[in-house]
Regions:
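C-terminal motif of bacterial Sec signal peptides marking the signal peptidase cleavage site
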Residues: 15-17
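Post-signal peptide N-terminal segment of mature Sec-exported envelope proteins
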Residues: 27-46
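Positively charged n-region of N-terminal signal peptides that target proteins for export
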Residues: 1-4
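Short, compact, well-ordered microdomains
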Residues: 106-151
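Short, non-transmembrane alpha-helical segments in secretory-pathway proteins
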Residues: 61-98
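Post-signal-peptide N-terminal segment of Sec-exported extracytoplasmic proteins
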Residues: 41-68
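Sec-dependent N-terminal signal peptides
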Residues: 6-10
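Bacterial signal peptide processing site
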Residues: 19-22
């Protein structure tokens, strides 16, 4: 019996330690609306961030939580499809990690996580790491140092 109690206690401690008790994300905006889509099914992004933390810092991720989490991944493709390198270079992106659990009412589990993507383009010496939040909403703009791809609305 003691053995089961110890195992149950350890499991409970593990589960509760995985989620931060407070949300540190600073740029959530529940009133934000999903950007319009181009004919190519990418977001139409019209602004580049002047904030050097936007997208690069876990407290200021790109918030793409406009769809149910089960299909929200398509917003990643829509977002990166709207971006270019600073001189119009084509970008490539790869999901490399997930991190930074935070409390969220947008998930049955009561928590969300951030996904980390490495982005590169021709001439870029070191890939850029961009934090993406698929659970919460926010204004969608290009991170500092990126360009906006010329697309047909």
């Amino acid at each position: 019996m003691k053995k089961y109690l110890i195992i149950a206690f350890l499991l409970m401690a593990l589960v509760t330690s995985c989620v931060s008790t407070r949300n540190t994300i600073r740029n959530i905006d529940d009133t934000a609306i999903m950007p319009p889509l181009s004919k190519e099914k990418t977001f139409i992004v019209t602004e580049i961030s002047s904030d050097k933390k936007y997208g690069y810092d876990q407290d200021y991720p790109v918030n793409l939580g406009f769809l149910p989490i089960t299909i929200a991944e398509m917003n990643v493709k829509r977002f990166f499809g709207a971006l270019s390198g600073p001189e119009g270079q084509q970008i490539t992106y790869t999901k490399v990690d997930s991190c930074c659990p935070f409390p969220s009412k947008k998930n049955d589990m009561g928590a969300g996580i951030l996904d980390i993507y490495e982005v590169t383009w021709e001439g870029l010496a070191t890939p850029k790491r961009i934090y993406i939040n698929l659970y919460e909403k926010g204004k969608v703009i290009a991170p500092h140092g990126f360009g906006i791809r010329q697309i047909v609305p």
